């Protein structure tokens, strides 16, 4: 299945601080998606509805996000190490990977989500993505799961849980809305080192 989970990979106090900084930030934007050519879709609200902040891994010296980003990046790399151990021989020849592109912090209010099934590397502008990672920042008990279509797995959001999975079409997934609760996540991708 190649879906790896690690409970409490990110400490609760770090999760709460990320949420706190997210809510205080003036840099929040409506979540967006792009088409297969990399063009941002103007009205994607029927596909995905969220509020996002995008951070670059290079922002490690940022006075607000720097320490938090370092902790998040370390958590992802420790998770990647455990992922490789878990799946051993299947990943024997997998080259070193690095966090690529953006790190996205996302807030889904009640009834918001990434409604449609999707994969993470099926267009020219994101084909370098090998694995997806996501950390749930809070518990959601009423819906809010990440559903993996072909694996028939529903991953429940619990504070600090790290999930890593292949970015390809084999792992179509979607974010199920919670009708009553807000969900916070951090997500990004791992790609081959350049």
Can you describe what each PLM-predicted range is?
Residues 1-162, 170-194:
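Fe(II)/2-oxoglutarate oxygenase catalytic core
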């Amino acid at each position: 299945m190649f879906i790896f989970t690690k409970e409490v990979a990110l400490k609760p106090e770090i999760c709460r601080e990320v949420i706190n900084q997210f809510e205080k930030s003036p840099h929040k934007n409506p979540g967006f998606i792009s088409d297969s050519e990399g063009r941002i879709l103007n009205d994607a609200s029927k596909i995905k509805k969220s509020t996002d902040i995008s951070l670059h891994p290079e922002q490690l010296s940022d006075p607000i996000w720097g320490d938090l980003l370092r902790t998040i990046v370390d958590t992802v790399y420790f998770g990647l190490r455990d992922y490789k151990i878990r799946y051993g021989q299947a990943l024997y020849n997998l080259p070193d990977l690095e966090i690529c592109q953006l790190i996205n912090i996302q807030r889904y209010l009640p009834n918001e989500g990434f409604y449609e099934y999707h994969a993470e590397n099926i267009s020219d502008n994101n084909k370098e993505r090998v694995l997806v990672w996501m950390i749930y920042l809070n518990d959601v008990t009423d819906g809010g799961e990440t559903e993996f279509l072909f694996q028939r797995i529903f991953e429940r959001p619990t504070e600090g849980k790290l999930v890593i999975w292949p970015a390809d079409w084999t792992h179509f997934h979607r974010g199920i809305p919670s009708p009553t609760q807000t969900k916070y996540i951090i997500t990004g991708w791992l790609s081959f080192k350049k």
